[in-house]
Amino acid sequence: MPANPVLFQTLFNHYINIPHCRWLKIYGDSSSDEPIISVDWRDELLESPKTGNIHGGVITTLVDMASACTLAALFQQFETTATLDMRIDYLMQPVPDQPIHVRAHCYRQEGSIAFIRSHCFQNDETRPFALGMSTFIHNPLTQAEQQALQAYLQQEQAK
C-alpha cells in the first residue's frame, strides 16, 4: 500500500501523462505500491525494421517511469526527484507483437538517495527480458514550492 495513496495516484497519473509518455501510449496499473508500467508493441517503436528490436529508448522510458512511480509510493508528501543513474541489462529480445511491462522495487533508501531494481517482461513476470537498476535523489519541497504546488493543484481540480 502506498504511504499516501492520494499523492501516489496523483504522481502516477502525472508521470504517465508526460507528453513523451503519451506519445509512446504508455499506460499502467497503479493498484499496488510497485505499479506496472506498460506499452503495447507497435512497429513505429522499433529501432529498425530490419532487426525487429524495440528501440532502447522505449525500454529506458518504461524503466524510468516504473522506478519513479515506485519511489512515489514511498512519499508521505510531494518531493522533488531526479534520476541520477540507470543501467539496463538485456537478457534476451522481447517477443514481437506482445505488450511490454515493467515493475520496479525500491530495495534500499539512504537519506535522500533511493536504489531501485526493475524487471521488463511480457507474458510471464518470472521471465524478464531485461533488468534495470536506477538511483534516484529525492528531497522535500520548500515552503514556496509547496505553496506553488497547492495553487497548481487547485487550478487543475477546477478544470
Say what each PLM segment does.
Residues W23-I54:
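Catalytic strand-loop segment that frames the active site of acyl-thioester-processing enzymes
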Residues M1-D29:
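N-terminal leader/capping segments at the start of a protein or of a new domain
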Residues I36-S38, H101, F115:
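General beta-strand recognition
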Residues W23, T83-D85, I113-F115:
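Short coil/loop residues immediately preceding or within conserved phosphate-binding loops
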Residues K50-D64, A68, T83:
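Compact, glycine-rich, soluble single-domain proteins
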Residues A68-H101, M133:
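Hydrophobic beta-strand-centered segment that forms part of the acyl-chain substrate-binding groove
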Residues G57, M65, M86-M92, S118-F121, ...:
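Hydrophobic alpha-helical segments of small multi-pass membrane proteins
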Residues M1-V6, V95-P96, H105-K159:
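HotDog/MaoC-like acyl-thioester-processing domains
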